[in-house]
Amino acid sequence: MLTQKPKGTNDLFPPEVFLWEEIERKFREVCRRFGYQEIRTPIFEHTELFERGVGETTDIVEKEMYTFLDKAGRSITLRPEGTAAVIRAYVEAKKYADPGPAKYFYIGPMFRYDKPQAGRLRQFHQLGVEILGSDEPMVDAEVILMALEFYREIGLNDVELRLNSVGCPECRKSLREKLINYFEERKEELCDLCKARLNRNPLRILDCKNESCQKIAQNAPTPLSELCPDCREHFTEVRKYLDLAQVKYVIDPFLVRGLDYYTKTAFEFVVPEIGAQSSIGGGGRYNGLIREIGGPDQPGIGFALGEERTILALKRKSEEISVPVPDLFVCLLGEEAREYGFPLINELRRLNLWVETDYQGKSLKAQLKAANRLKAKAALIIGEEELKSGRFILRDLDTGEQVELSRDELIEKYARERGKDNA
C-alpha cells in the first residue's frame, strides 16, 4: 500500500500535466475577459457549511462527504463542491457590503466518496465561477455564454447546453405536493433511493438515473409546469438573451441538478460521446444560499466545470493542445565548459527561456541525443575549442542548420526574440 495511490485518485506526470496547465491557463484568460477575479478557499470547511448549504437530503451530504473530527472534536469536511465555500468566504469577509456584483472564479480539487470510474474520481478538479449580487436574467445568460466560450477556446465546439428553470420556493410548494401525490401512486416501482426521497426531496426523483424511475418520471409534473409568473418571466428573459447571442440550447424539464440550493435557472453542458458521464459541467442560480449561510438576502449564480471530464472529452475528440518544449539544450563538454556554462545558463533563463543541460558529463553525442529526446528547439555546444575561440555553436535541431555566436551575440539574439533589450 505504501507505493499505491488511494483509490479514486490520480497522479499527473508530464506531458499530461501540460494539458492541465493549458486548460487552466485558458480558463483564467476567459474569466478575466469577463471581469472575474480569482478566489482561493480552504480545501476543508466545517461540516455544517455543506449540510446547510448543499442540503442535508442530497446524495453528497448523505453518503459522499469525507468527514472527520479534528483534534478539538470539531466536525470537518473536505469540500465536495466549491460554491458553499466561496459564499462562506464572501459572508465572513463582509464582501456583500462592497459595490457589486462580486465576480469570482476558482480552480481546485474537490472530494467525494463515490464509485470511481472514467470521468468520476474521489479527488476531482473543478473550474468554477460565482457572480453574487444580481438577479438579472442577462447575468444568467452571460454566465452560460462564458462557459461555452471557454469550451470553444479549448476546441470543444459541439458541447450541448441543456437548460431548465427549477423555480423559486413559492413555485416548489405546489410542485412538491403534486410530485408526492404522483409518485406515491407509483411508489412500488421506484428504486429504494427514490422511495426514501419521496417525502423529503421528491424533486430529485426527476433526476434519478435508474431506468424504472426515469420511465415513471416521464409523465410527472415538472418545475416548468409550476413556475410562478415572476420565475416564468425570468426564464423567458434568459432564453431571450441566449437567443440574441445565437446560443443553441435544449429545454430539459427534468434537469434539476444534484444540489438543494438551486433556484430559477439550471443548466448542464453535455458531450454524449464520452458515455455515461456525459455531463462535463453545469450550474445555476442560488438566490437563497447567501442568506442560508448567514449573509444578507442577495442573489447569486455560478457554474462548475469538471476538469477531468473536460479532458476526457478532449481526448475522445483527439483534440491536441500544444505541449511546451525546451527552447535550448546547452551541451557542456568538460569541467571548464561546465564552469563557464553554469552562469550563462542562468543568464539565458532570466530571458524567460526554458534551458536544459546535462549534469553527468556525457559525450556530445549523448547530450545531443538527450536534447532530441526532449524535443528541444536548439542546442548550444560549448567545448574546449569553443572556449578558446570565444564562439559557440548554436544548432537548430529541426533543420540541422548551425551558426557560430559569441556570448554577447547569443544573449542579444534571444533577448531580441523575447522582446527584451538585455544586450
Curated annotation (Swiss-Prot):
GO terms for molecular function: ATP binding; catalytic activity, acting on a protein; histidine-tRNA ligase activity; transferase activity. It is found in: Cytoplasm. Keywords: Aminoacyl-tRNA synthetase, ATP-binding, Cytoplasm, Ligase, Nucleotide-binding, Protein biosynthesis. Transmembrane segments: none annotated. Belongs to the class-II aminoacyl-tRNA synthetase family. The gene is hisS. One of its GO terms (cellular component) is cytoplasm. This is Histidine--tRNA ligase. Its main location: cytoplasm. It catalyses: tRNA(His) + L-histidine + ATP = L-histidyl-tRNA(His) + AMP + diphosphate + H(+). One of its GO terms (biological process) is histidyl-tRNA aminoacylation. Its EC number is 6.1.1.21.
